[in-house]
Each structure stands twice: as structure tokens, then as C-alpha cells.
């Protein structure tokens, strides 16, 4: 696992430092073959260090089947170098470096080959709809404008066609396939803008890796063995019944499937599970069974406007044909909390009148567990008010920097009108007395004022390698803004789907290029810990509170750590850590925004005498910190930066 401290003088990780001298020597040796004096205005020169390394990431999603492109030309300031796509294909297929790529041999390692060979496994019918929704969304034009800055000689129409056709490729989308299919003989990439674009796509990695070593160091405690007669990770003694029901909300025209888990003897609060965008009610099935086996009644509901069936056009009670402007309807951010309140109302009736389920639902004491967008649902029910002004300010920026899929998703809510927002002044449901939010997508939906309204106990999970809902903006900063009783469970190395039920996950995506998830065997310890901690957290509302309290301690969580995942549990972050979080997020946002704003500005003329410093001087840090990659020459970069300052 790559780790890096937060200090500006120690950006690279211990792992990086161990290999830096080797890579620096290679890089410097390679550059020593260049002429001592490199002109900034003459004929094309050798491409800058790292440009080819960036190439696969720059080109993802930027090509179409049609006229086959033969070469790619990368422009970095006054430098311009082209390579044959066939040479890249040969390297990807065989591992051999053809003569046309010999110049870049030091950079063509196994990670680059893996990136070139990787495919995004996607059902063409689903991919086509997803891209179509994106292109017709309020963010679509901004997205295309950003791509056009990176590919300056491509028209908006070419980019749109490219994206649409790429999503239809059978067998998945490969980067070289996208490049080869672009309808131009030579594809020109503006490296500075493309690096900035790649930076936004990979900023979650930068944030995660920059914080990982700091978190591991500062959240670690001297652990003592937990002595107890019970093990909250083991299944309880009760036999669990499961029943599926379909509830119809005629007023809102929504059909809501629910899975009920209950036992012969029921006690404690009712547990409601809300899934994330594109998932379903079975995403946390293992956790539902576990909690129910200890005598808790669990209800897992499905949101018809944002579930996996909705993506394929087969959802109950929600037609995708009504969607015109966003990845999902803006009203879904109002409907989701209302789905839960509606289900509670119906369960209350069953609790009174059903012969089978009488007394099974404690609807006056409810714990809501939400994953991803379900985390938003839970906190909205707990009193956090959607901050429309805060959201629109971010989403309507003329140079928006959209760092993660979670940001794009949350911007769908920006199309809510003030009247709609005012009509739902508060989605708070007083029956919700606890929340467990796992990898929540909340960083843009709530501001500090709205999060301060959450007074119920909250357990939040953050994964430092989560590229869907990046930990810095979506969990760590929001956690510091909660004012009630709270716990932060940090999975250092954890990803977005690490807590998902392996029986209900598509394992293809754990090895995908764009969704970097861990195999289930590496994340089992986290799911085991979640079983124990969730049970202990819910039991705090029962007479068993003191008995389960030891399982809500830092030492207990830490005992589940593995080589792949370091697990920590804290009730608060270390002093001044909020400032460190802001330092991790804001400088890169400003850097990328300013880089994109420059657009196609002409490069400055001049002469560069120091080859390595000249080539590295204008590149953003995140160029060197990529998933699966090595931070090339980062030490030299920062030493030179300090000298210049």
C-alpha cells in the first residue's frame, strides 16, 4: 500500500522513498542522453518525463470506433512528440518494447502495461444509457468542455460520438481500443491540460495516500486485549426469518421493495438499511442477517429512483424516460428520505394489525444504516438539511473541478428549485435515533451548518482508497462538523465496496481499471469488524449497552488490522487535524482549477539549460502519484521548487 505523509517536505511515502533513488537514477540517466541545451521554440523535442506514463490515463474515454487513429501526439508546452499506436499495442500485448518506444523504455514497466491492457467490463446497454445521461445532464457540457481543453483539435461532436460509441464496445472498453478508434489519423493531447484533467480524476488517490501514513500514526493506540464473554462478530443464537414485501406509495407513485429480517424474540431498535446509487437492498445482506440473529428486526429497502434496476430501465415505480437533465432525478434526494419515512409508517401499521409480524417493529426507535448515497439518506433523516446554495455554488462554478463520481452524483441535486427545497424544509424523522453511515456521499450536499443539526449518535466509516466517495471531502471533513455523539471507523486502504456483501458484488469490478476495489479476501477483516461494531453501536440503545461498550474502542478496532487494511476507531480526530485535511484538499483544487482555466494559452518562449528541473518544474504533484504507479522524481521536483521560492 502506498502511503505518504501530509507535510509538504515529505509528500512521498516510505515505500516511495525506498525506490526513489533507483527511479531517479534511471530518469537522470535517460535525460543525460538529451542535448545539454534544450530549445523551447525549435523543432519537437523528446517528451517530458512521465508524459508517456500519463498517456493511458489521459486517453481513457476519448476515442470512438470509426476512422482508425495511427499515432498520438503529446504536446507539453513547446515540446511535441508522437508515437505510433501500433507500438503501444505491441508493448501491451507482448511486453516487448519496439524501436519506436525505446526512448521511453525506463518508464514502460509492468504497471503501464497493465493499464494499457485493462478493460472496463460494462454491459454495453447500460454503458450507453449512462453516457447518454451524462451528455444530457447539466454537467455534460462542462465535462465536454474540459475534455476539449485536453484534446484541443477535437470538436464537441467528435467527443460526444466518441463517448457514445466507446460505451457500446463488446467485451469492455480498453484504453488502446478507444485511442485506436478515434476518427483522426493523429490524436493530439495537450499534456498540461490532460495532466490537470487526470489530476482531478486521480485526486482521491492523492488525498488518500497523503493522509494514510498520518492517520495510521496518529490514530494508533497502545492496544490491550479485549476480555469479554461475548464475541459480537459471531452470529447470534436466534433463527432468522426473511420475507420480501412490495409497498406502494400511491401519493408519490413509488413502489418500494423491502426485505424483512426478524426472529422469534425481538428487542431493541428497528434497523433500516438504505443502499447507495446503482445498488440494491441486498448490498449489506450479510450485516442484516447478523444483526437479526441477535434479536434485532432489520428492514432493507430499495429506492426505485436510484437502484440498479433503475439503471437498466426495469425499476418498479420509476420511469427513466422522465429523466432529462441528470444522472438521476434531482427529486431523488427528497424521495429517498421520504421512502424510509413511508416504510416506517407502513411497518407501524403491520406492527399493530399483522398476525405474523405483530410487535416485531419498534418504529419509535430506529437506527438507519446507509451506504454511499444511503449515507446521505440517513443523515437527512437525522436532521441534516440539504444545503442547496452550498451545492449550487460548487456545481455551477464556471471552471468546476469534479473530483469524483460522488461529486457528479451530488450535483444532480443542484437542479432542485428553491420552491422544492422550501417545500421539504426538513426531511428529519424524529423516529430516527441513530445513524451508521458507510462511505457516505455527503461532502457537497451538506455544509457545516446543516451537519451541526445532527444530534443523534452517528457511526461513520471512511476508506482512504475510496475513489468513488473520497475520504477527505466526503467523510473526514463532514465528520469534524457533526456535533453529536460520534465515532469514526477508518479503514486505511479501504475502498468504496469493501463493506459490500461479496455474494452480491460483481467481482469483475474488483479488478477493473477505473474502479480499484480490493478482492474479498483482503476486506473480510473489515466486514467482520463492521459486524461487531455495528451490533455494539445499536446495542447502546438497549439494557445491554455497558456489556457491548468495550467493542466501541480504538483497541478493539485496531485488533482487526491486517497487512492490507489498517483499521482504527475514534470518537474524534486528533487536534488540528481538520486543518491538515483542508491542506490536503484545497491546494490541489486551486492548482487544477487554475491550470484548466488557462485553457489553450500559448507557451512561453525561452531557453532551458537544466533538463530535469525544466521538464519537471511546471508539472503538478499529482502527475507523479497515480494508482499503481511510482512517484517519479518527486524528491527532485520539490527540492527545485524550494530553491525557486
What are these model-predicted stretches?
Residues 79-84, 89-226:
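Mature extracellular/secreted ectodomains of secretory-pathway proteins
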Residues 219-266:
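N-terminal cap/lid segment of alpha/beta-hydrolase-fold proteins
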Residues 268-276:
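Short beta-strand element of the alpha/beta-hydrolase
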Residues 283-302:
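Short amphipathic alpha-helix adjacent to the substrate-entry channel of hydrolases
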Residues 323-359, 398:
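Alpha/beta-hydrolase active-site loop
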Residues 348, 375-387:
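Short glycine-enriched nucleophile-adjacent loop
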Residues 454, 460-462:
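Short beta-strand/loop motif that positions the catalytic acidic residue
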Amino acid at each position: 500500500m502506498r502511503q505518504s505523509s501530509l507535510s509538504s517536505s515529505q509528500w512521498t511515502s516510505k515505500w516511495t522513498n525506498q525506490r526513489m533513488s533507483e527511479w531517479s537514477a534511471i530518469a537522470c540517466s535517460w535525460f543525460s542522453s538529451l542535448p545539454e541545451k534544450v530549445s523551447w521554440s525549435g523543432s519537437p523535442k523528446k517528451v517530458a518525463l512521465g508524459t508517456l506514463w500519463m498517456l493511458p490515463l489521459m486517453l481513457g474515454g476519448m476515442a470512438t470506433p470509426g476512422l482508425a487513429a495511427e499515432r498520438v501526439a503529446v504536446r507539453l508546452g513547446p515540446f511535441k512528440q508522437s508515437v505510433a499506436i501500433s507500438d503501444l499495442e505491441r508493448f501491451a500485448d507482448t511486453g516487448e518494447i519496439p524501436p519506436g518506444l525505446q526512448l521511453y523504455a525506463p518508464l514502460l514497466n509492468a504497471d503501464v502495461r497493465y493499464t494499457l491492457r485493462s478493460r472496463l467490463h460494462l454491459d454495453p446497454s447500460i454503458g450507453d444509457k449512462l453516457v447518454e445521461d451524462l451528455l444530457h445532464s447539466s454537467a455534460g457540457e462542462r465535462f465536454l468542455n474540459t475534455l476539449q481543453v485536453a484534446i484541443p483539435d477535437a470538436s464537441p461532436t467528435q467527443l460526444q460520438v466518441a463517448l457514445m460509441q466507446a460505451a457500446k464496445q463488446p467485451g469492455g472498453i480498453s484504453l488502446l481500443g478507444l485511442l485506436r478508434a478515434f476518427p483522426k489519423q493523429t490524436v493530439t493531447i495537450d499534456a498540461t491540460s490532460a495532466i490537470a484533467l487526470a489530476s482531478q480524476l486521480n485526486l482521491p488517490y492523492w488525498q488518500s495516500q497523503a493522509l494514510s501514513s498520518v492517520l495510521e500514526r496518529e490514530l494508533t493506540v497502545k492496544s490491550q486485549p479485549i476480555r469479554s464473554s461475548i464475541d459480537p462478530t459471531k452470529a447470534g443464537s436466534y433463527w432468522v426469518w426473511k420475507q420480501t414485501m412490495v409497498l406502494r406509495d400511491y401519493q408519490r407513485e413509488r413502489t418500494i421493495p423491502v426485505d424483512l429480517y426478524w426472529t422469534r424474540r425481538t428487542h431493541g431498535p428497528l434497523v433500516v438499511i438504505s443502499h447507495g446509487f446503482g445498488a440494491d437492498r441486498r448490498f449489506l445482506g450479510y450485516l442484516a442477517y447478523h444483526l437479526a440473529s441477535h434479536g434485532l428486526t432489520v428492514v432493507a429497502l430499495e429506492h426505485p429512483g436510484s437502484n440498479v434496476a433503475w439503471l437498466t430501465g426495469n425499476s418498479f415505480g420509476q420511469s427513466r424516460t422522465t429523466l432529462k437533465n441528470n444522472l438521476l432525478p434531482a427529486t431523488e434526494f427528497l424521495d429517498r428520505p421520504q421512502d424510509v419515512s413511508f416504510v416506517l409508517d407502513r411497518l407501524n401499521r403491520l406492527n399493530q394489525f399483522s398476525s405474523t409480524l405483530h410487535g416485531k417493529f419498534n418504529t419509535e426507535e430506529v437506527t438507519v444504516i446507509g451506504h454511499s448515497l444511503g449515507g446521505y439518506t440517513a443523515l437527512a433523516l437525522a436532521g441534516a438539511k440539504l444545503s442547496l446554495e452550498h451545492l449550487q455554488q460548487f456545481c455551477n462554478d464556471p471552471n468546476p473541478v469534479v473530483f469524483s463520481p460522488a461529486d457528479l452524483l451530488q450535483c444532480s441535486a443542484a437542479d432542485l428549485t428553491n420552491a422544492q427545497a422550501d417545500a421539504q424544509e426538513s426531511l428529519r424523522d424524529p423516529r430516527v435515533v441513530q445513524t451508521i453511515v458507510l462511505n457516505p456521499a455527503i461532502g457537497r450536499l451538506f455544509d457545516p451548518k446543516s451537519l451541526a443539526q445532527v444530534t443523534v449518535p452517528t457511526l461513520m466509516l471512511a476508506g482512504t482508497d475510496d475513489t468513488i466517495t473520497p475520504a477527505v471531502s466526503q467523510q473526514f471533513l463532514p465528520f469534524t462538523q457533526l456535533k453529536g455523539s460520534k465515532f469514526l471507523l477508518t479503514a486505511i486502504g479501504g475502498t468504496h465496496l469493501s463493506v459490500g456483501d461479496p455474494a452480491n458484488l460483481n467481482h469483475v469490478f474488483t479488478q477493473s481499471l477505473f474502479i480499484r476495489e480490493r478482492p474479498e479476501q483482503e476486506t473480510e477483516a473489515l466486514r467482520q469488524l463492521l459486524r461487531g461494531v455495528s451490533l455494539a453501536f445499536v446495542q447502546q440503545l438497549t439494557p445491554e449497552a455497558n456489556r457491548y461498550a468495550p467493542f466501541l474502542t480504538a483497541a478493539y478496532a485496531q485488533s482487526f488490522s491486517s497487512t492490507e487494511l489498517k483499521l482504527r476507531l475514534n470518537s474524534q480526530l486528533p487536534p488540528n487535524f481538520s486543518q491538515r485535511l483542508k491542506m490536503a484538499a484545497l491546494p490541489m483544487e486551486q492548482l487544477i482549477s487554475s491550470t484548466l482555466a488557462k485553457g489553450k494559452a500559448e507557451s512561453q518562449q525561452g531557453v532551458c539549460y537544466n533538463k530535469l528541473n525544466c521538464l519537471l518544474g511546471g508539472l503538478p504533484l499529482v502527475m507523479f502519484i497515480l494508482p499503481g504507479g511510482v512517484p517519479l522524481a518527486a524528491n527532485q521536483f520539490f527540492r527545485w521548487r524550494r530553491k525557486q521560492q
